[in-house]
């Protein structure tokens, strides 16, 4: 019987939402849980009333269910400590979770023990978008681990890669690293899109616009085609530059100045 019960539990745990990812609940919800639990125990011992038992049980289930809902009143940005590397997570008040890069060359298993642990701490069971600037280890090796950790309690929606022209490759290593990344994503069944300058996504007040690379950009290294994203949320803006180098920065400045000129603005960078 115990063996059958174990196998049944193991089987059911693979279904989506079979496991509730609560994250770390706030003090008020922890207090509410214990308050209901104590009232239930006291009512059961003193009153021995089945109706009160039933009411307390329903309240306890409601409290436990509510533990998994973390409401953000504003956008939250977390710059994770990954050592020599980069990993930034954004949570919007609409409930979108976005990751910009995730890797390190100074910390081992940064995906499992830093990024994934942080997401579980926040009660996040899915990343809507993962923006990868370029496939260098200090920006992507943690994402490989996140892909391996995908299960019924965690999933990755869409991965955004820089839209580079393969025919323009000068450094073979840069091309090989990108091909490896694409193959891993394809085998994992994760949706992949490519962003060129001007492409954007928007959700409520939150938007991400690709500033680089331009379509057909001739790159010389992985850093050279590093995607640059402009994140905007209301009056707040943040430029995610990855490892963009001087050539890429010059290209972005020229594009911005050209657009400003077309719009009749006198501002120059």
What is the predicted role of each segment?
Residues 2-269:
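Non-globular, low-confidence helical/coil segments that flank catalytic cores
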């Amino acid at each position: 019987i115990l063996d059958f019960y174990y196998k049944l539990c193991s089987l059911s745990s693979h279904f989506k939402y079979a496991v509730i990812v609560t994250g770390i609940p706030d003090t008020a919800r922890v207090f509410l849980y214990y308050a209901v639990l104590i009232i239930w125990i006291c009512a059961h011992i003193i009153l021995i009333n089945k109706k009160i038992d039933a009411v307390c049980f329903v309240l306890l289930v409601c409290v436990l269910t509510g533990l998994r809902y973390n409401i953000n009143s504003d956008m939250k940005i977390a710059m994770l400590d990954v050592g020599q590397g980069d990993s930034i997570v954004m949570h919007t008040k609409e409930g979108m979770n976005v990751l910009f890069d995730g890797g390190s060359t100074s910390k081992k298993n940064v995906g499992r023990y830093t990024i994934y642990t942080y997401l579980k701490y926040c009660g996040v069971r899915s990343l809507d978008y993962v923006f990868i600037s370029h496939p260098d280890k200090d920006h992507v090796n943690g994402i490989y681990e996140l892909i391996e950790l995908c299960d019924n309690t965690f999933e990755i929606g869409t991965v955004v890669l820089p839209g580079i022209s393969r025919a323009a490759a000068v450094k073979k290593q840069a091309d090989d690293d990108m091909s490896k990344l694409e193959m891993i994503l394809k085998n994992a069944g994760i949706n992949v899109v490519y962003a060129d300058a001007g492409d954007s996504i928007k959700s409520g007040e939150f938007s991400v616009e690709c500033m680089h690379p331009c379509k057909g950009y001739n790159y010389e290294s992985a850093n050279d085609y590093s995607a640059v994203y402009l994140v905007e949320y209301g009056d707040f803006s943040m430029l995610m530059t990855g490892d963009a180098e001087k050539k890429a920065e010059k290209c972005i400045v020229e594009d911005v100045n050209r657009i400003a000129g077309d719009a009749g603005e006198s501002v120059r960078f």
